[in-house]
């Protein structure tokens, strides 16, 4: 290998090239690594050319050494060095390949290197944080303390990590846009015909909410009293994360969709060249404002509709047996109709007006959903009975877990109301039971087949699973940072880790869970034999699949430092057939 120095418009462009001979004896060369313009590195290295020439010589020496057998000698008296890290997490090479090749994150920061002189490398810090979120989720401090195990040099301080969070937040929107564009350039157009949207929240282990910030008390999905923040997430039709937005904890779910669509570049009213998309969401997003805006933008929607809370005319139609078509085993039935949905919009004059939007209403009944609803209700009924029996209604009356208890105070002979008299609300139980097993979906796509609409709606499980991965596997909450810019940067890291994880699952045939992949990658740990060699003792069919997907070999039992560095260099290069 040698360092090529090409002069381009007065500047020197550096790359590492390898010479080789063709079968007919001619000498050729191929680019091993593109480095960039020499002057872009002057703030890091005093003499960039001398630095990279030394780097090439070091790689050549390592390549020569790799040809020889690795011989390690141990002394019985040798003791463990408490000061040195004896492990290296080479499993990080796999997500690193997606980080660089598919998402182009290094390219994003490299373009901004000349615009600002960094005392630290924000790309390297982000790469470490994303790996930590996948393999060993914890605080930013914990990620920093694990840096010696990361298979790239991490010459930055803990203060640099926190400084980088501010920088990452500043460029978060541009980075997400860049990742989407780069992913399309590598893998082809994204499946945006349908985009799935949902909202969840994450709690903070603090007592007081922010006076002016994101951490606010709201409706916690985990029923916690702690301050929370809201996260709205879009997935494309293949289940890959497409964009996200962060909202204050007291924001109502239904108010998040339109700002999230705007941020993702999905609101384009009046643009005939814009790509039409169909937004698929749950009943919490089924509001007049959302439907009106989506329709006016020229987009479509598939939204669920609560049967229990539906208008009487719609509820009666859903519960009426007439028109249903059922399968042979009588476990599923469906019907549909074209209707006008009333929505209420506020005009420029501030007045609220009723307008109608033509929709297709699809109602279906499922035995599985019916039995699940009955089972869940029995638990709530029993809790209501227990609360009434134990006299615990004074503090529990507002909770949904005892929603089938009602207060019917007796009336004394004097006509005065007696003390509380809690009883089971049989009429409410009967009304809810009548709706068991029924679903209703409204869609703008009047020509779409009933089954296709139902299957599109059922695709929401992917976004629910994404939130589960973020919360359980990636430990996105509780959040251990407090400044708003750092909180937003934290969720950028989580989002990137989720996107990388979904790409790894896609490339392994979606045969493995996120937890299985994280465990497999976390197991690829080398233990230091001497100053130059590491011993690996973990290999499975899954680790082979993951390594094969990114074109590297992680099956060798002993690797030198040079070979590890070469693997990490290889995953930054485009994968060739």
Would you name each region that the model predicts?
Residues 36, 483-504:
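Basic, amphipathic alpha-helical segments enriched in Lys/Arg and hydrophobic/aromatic residues
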Residues 252, 278-289, 307-309, 485-488:
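Acidic, metal-coordinating catalytic cores used for nucleic-acid/nucleotide bond scission
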Residues 227-229, 246, 300, 305-456, ...:
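An anionic, glycine-rich sequence signature occurring as long contiguous blocks
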Residues 1-212, 225, 232-250, 428, ...:
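Dynamic "connector" segments at or just before major functional cores
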Residues 245-268:
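Active-site beta-loop-alpha junctions of metal-dependent nucleic acid enzymes
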Residues 453-480:
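Short amphipathic alpha-helical "interface-anchor" segments enriched in bulky aromatics
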Residues 23-24, 150-156, 188-189, 237-240, ...:
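Secondary-structure transition/capping motifs at alpha-helix termini
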Residues 497-498, 503-531:
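Conserved nucleotidyltransferase catalytic core and NTase-mimicking acidic/glycine-rich helix/loop elements
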């Amino acid at each position: 290998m040698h360092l090529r120095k090409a002069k381009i418009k007065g500047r020197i462009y550096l790359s590492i090239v390898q010479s080789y001979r063709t079968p007919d004896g001619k000498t050729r060369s191929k680019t091993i690594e593109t480095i960039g313009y020499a002057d872009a590195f002057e703030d890091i290295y005093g003499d960039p050319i001398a630095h990279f020439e030394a780097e090439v010589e070091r790689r050549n020496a390592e390549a020569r050494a790799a040809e020889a057998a690795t011989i390690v000698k141990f002394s019985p008296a040798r003791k463990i060095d408490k000061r040195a890290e004896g492990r290296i997490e080479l499993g990080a090479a796999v997500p690193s390949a997606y980080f660089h090749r598919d998402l182009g994150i290094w390219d994003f920061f490299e373009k901004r290197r000349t615009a600002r002189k960094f005392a630290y490398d924000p790309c390297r810090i982000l790469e470490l944080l994303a790996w930590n979120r996948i393999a060993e989720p914890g605080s930013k401090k914990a990620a920093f303390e694990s840096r010696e195990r990361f298979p790239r040099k991490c010459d930055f301080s803990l203060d640099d990590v926190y400084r980088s969070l501010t920088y990452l937040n500043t460029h978060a929107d541009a980075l997400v846009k860049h990742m989407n564009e780069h992913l399309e350039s590598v893998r082809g157009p994204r499946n945006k015909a349908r985009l799935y949207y949902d909202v969840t929240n994450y709690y903070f282990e603090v007592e007081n909410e922010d006076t002016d910030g994101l951490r606010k008390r709201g409706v916690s999905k985990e029923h916690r009293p702690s301050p929370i923040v809201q996260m709205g997430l879009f997935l494309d039709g293949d289940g890959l994360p497409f964009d996200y937005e962060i909202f204050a904890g007291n924001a109502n779910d239904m108010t998040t969709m339109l700002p999230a669509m705007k941020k993702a570049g999905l609101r384009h009213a009046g643009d005939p060249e814009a790509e039409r998309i169909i937004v698929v969401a749950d009943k919490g997003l089924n509001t007049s404002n959302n439907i009106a805006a989506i329709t006016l933008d020229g987009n479509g929607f598939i939204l669920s509709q609560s049967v229990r809370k539906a208008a009487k005319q719609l509820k009666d139609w859903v519960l009426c047996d007439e028109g249903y078509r059922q399968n042979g085993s009588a476990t599923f039935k469906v019907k549909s109709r074209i209707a006008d949905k009333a929505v209420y919009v506020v005009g420029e004059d501030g007045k609220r007006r009723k307008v109608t939007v033509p929709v297709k209403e699809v109602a279906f009944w499922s035995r599985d959903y019916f039995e699940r609803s009955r089972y869940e209700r029995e638990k709530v009924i029993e809790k209501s009975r227990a609360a009434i029996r134990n006299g615990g209604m004074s503090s529990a009356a507002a909770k949904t877990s005892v929603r089938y208890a009602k207060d019917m105070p007796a009336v004394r002979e004097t006509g005065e109301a007696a003390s509380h008299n809690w009883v089971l609300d049989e009429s409410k139980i009967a009304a809810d039971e009548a709706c068991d097993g029924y679903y209703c979906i409204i869609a703008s796509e009047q020509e779409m087949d009933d089954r296709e609409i139902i299957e599109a709606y059922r695709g929401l499980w992917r976004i629910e699973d994404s939130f589960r991965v973020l919360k359980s596997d990636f430990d996105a909450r509780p959040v251990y940072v407090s400044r708003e810019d750092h909180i937003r940067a934290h969720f950028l890291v989580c989002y990137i880790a989720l996107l990388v994880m979904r790409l790894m699952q896609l490339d392994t045939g979606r045969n493995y869970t996120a937890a299985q992949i994280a465990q497999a990658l976390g197991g690829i740990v080398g233990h230091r034999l001497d100053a130059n060699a590491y011993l690996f003792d973990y290999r499975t069919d899954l680790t082979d699949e993951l390594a094969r997907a990114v074109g590297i070999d992680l099956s060798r039992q002993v690797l030198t430092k040079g070979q590890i560095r070469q693997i990490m260099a290889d995953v930054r290069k485009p994968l060739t057939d």
